[in-house]
Curated annotation (Swiss-Prot):
SUPFAM superfamilies from the UniProt entry: Formate/glycerate dehydrogenase catalytic domain-like, NAD(P)-binding Rossmann-fold domains
Cell compartment(s), UniProt: Cytoplasm
Pathway membership: Amino-acid biosynthesis; L-homocysteine biosynthesis; L-homocysteine from S-adenosyl-L-homocysteine: step 1/1
Family annotation (InterPro entries): Adenosylhomocyst_ase-like_sf (IPR042172), Adenosylhomocysteinase-like (IPR000043), Ado_hCys_hydrolase_NAD-bd (IPR015878), NAD(P)-bd_dom_sf (IPR036291), S-Ado-L-homoCys_hydrolase_CS (IPR020082)
GO biological process: L-homocysteine biosynthetic process; one-carbon metabolic process; S-adenosylmethionine cycle
The keyword NAD belongs to this UniProt entry's keyword annotation: yes
Protein name per UniProt: Adenosylhomocysteinase
Gene Ontology, cellular component aspect: cytosol
Pfam families in the record: AdoHcyase, AdoHcyase_NAD
Length: 416
């Protein structure tokens, strides 16, 4: 008989349930969607495999899907991001969760294989590790999947590559590309939670520090804005000339990483690319420089190069490692170069995940409702869904907006 769940400590379930209830109070849109079905079960009998950070907000999504009738299995999307108390609460509630904080790479792969082995109808992913597994080692299972969703920029990039090669086995809805996701989750959520992670890991004063932000996409914009708001001097590095120009006109210093390396007190990567901070950059950094990554995978900082160029390494705080270089300089790495906001903090605030996970829930309903009719490609979230989520969010915030008059609607349709 298949194992029902695996978590670190089931006795943490009470604490986890309180965390989930706190998130529910701050996720009114998703809770309204949950209750809108009444006693209907639109996902009755549908098996959902989810690869998501196991947080209190994820729990609200998972329990919404289950209330709608789905059979949900959950694996983490990062070995270090699971909130053990939340995992315990979900297990106690009967969810098939296979996650604990501090998994080895082998345990992480086992968890993904375990949820994939439940032969899901729908796949929810954050980073596309589960999608890729279903397209490679477990392809026979992937061929039976109705469709999936993807939460992150990194994951969408991987899935579009599969689509370009003609290898995508099932339709995927790019939840990341919803306006009510990336404009808020990526910018406000990551911006705030990255600062939170750096502060929890180091407890340094931000005011007066030089913070180098690599990447000025929506994530980088949010990080740069929040650090500037706390009094930091922010330097942005970019490879995209349009984004670099935007950063410059937003008032930030823009330069190359080679130039910024000797300037920064804190370095944050947010590019989705590999070795953005490489050995040659670390060789130029000042004593005491702090390195953190806000991108999905731990590839943006060349940790292997840092290990190789160091003469010693020690854990100086819970999520902070000190690397001593041959000349005596010390560099500090937060969370092994993994997602700083989820390793050293609690991830995005519930209020922004409310919109992201509402989009996820609606995408799952769409896949189930249009089974067999969606093309095998990466789909964008429809504008009508974005507007619905935005309107619901505004309502829960007590914000009212205008509507076009009939005269205004007619005016916008004329050409002279």
């Amino acid at each position: 008989m298949a194992q029902g769940f695996k978590v670190r400590d089931l006795s943490l379930a009470g604490e986890g349930r309180m965390q989930i209830e706190w998130a529910e109070r701050h996720m009114p849109v998703l809770m309204r969607l949950r209750s809108s079905m009444g006693g209907d079960k639109p996902l009755s009998g549908v098996r959902v495999a989810a690869c998501l950070h196991v947080t209190k907000e994820t729990a609200v999504l998972v329990e919404t899907l289950r209330k709608w009738g789905a059979e949900v299995y959950l694996a983490p999307s990062n070995p270090l991001s699971t909130q053990d108390e939340v995992a315990a609460a979900l297990a106690e509630a009967g969810i098939g969760v296979f996650a604990w904080r501090g998994m080895t790479p082998e345990e992480y792969k086992w968890a993904l294989s375990t949820v994939a082995g439940r032969e899901p109808d729908i796949v929810i992913d954050d980073g596309a590790d589960l999608h890729v597994l279903l397209h490679e080692e477990m392809r026979s299972v992937g061929e039976k999947v109705w469709g999936g969703t993807e939460e992150t920029t990194t994951g969408v990039i991987r899935l579009r590559a599969l689509e370009r090669e003609g290898r995508l086995l099932y339709p995927v809805i790019a939840v990341n590309d919803a306006l009510t996701k990336f404009m808020f989750d990526n910018r406000y959520g990551t911006g705030q939670s990255t600062v939170d992670g750096v502060l929890r890991a180091t407890n340094i004063l931000i005011a007066g520090k030089t913070v180098v932000v690599a990447g000025y996409g929506w994530v980088g914009r949010g990080i740069a804005a929040r650090f500037r708001g706390m009094g930091a001097k922010v330097v942005v590095t970019e490879v995209d000339p349009v984004r670099a120009l935007e950063a410059a006109m937003d008032g930030f210093t823009v330069t190359t990483m080679d130039e910024a390396a000797s300037l920064g007190d804190v370095f944050i990567t947010a590019t989705g690319n590999i070795n953005v901070i490489d050995a040659r950059h670390m060789e130029k950094m000042k004593d005491g420089a702090i390195l953190a990554n806000a991108g999905h995978f731990n590839v943006e900082i060349n940790v292997a190069a840092l290990e190789e160029m160091s003469v010693s390494k020690r854990r100086v705080r819970r999520y902070l490692d000190e690397y001593r270089l041959p000349d005596g300089r010390r560099l500090y790495l937060i969370g092994e170069g993994r997602l700083v906001n989820l390793v050293a903090a609690e991830g995005h605030p519930s209020e922004v995940m409310d919109m992201s996970f509402s989009n996820q829930a609606l995408a799952v309903l769409k896949i189930a409702g249009e089974r067999g009719r969606l093309e095998k490609r990466v789909h964008r979230v429809e504008r009508i869904q974005d507007e619905m989520v935005a309107r619901l969010k505004l309502e829960t915030m007590g914000v009212r907006i205008d509507s076009l008059t009939e005269e205004q609607k007619l005016y916008l349709q004329k050409w002279k």
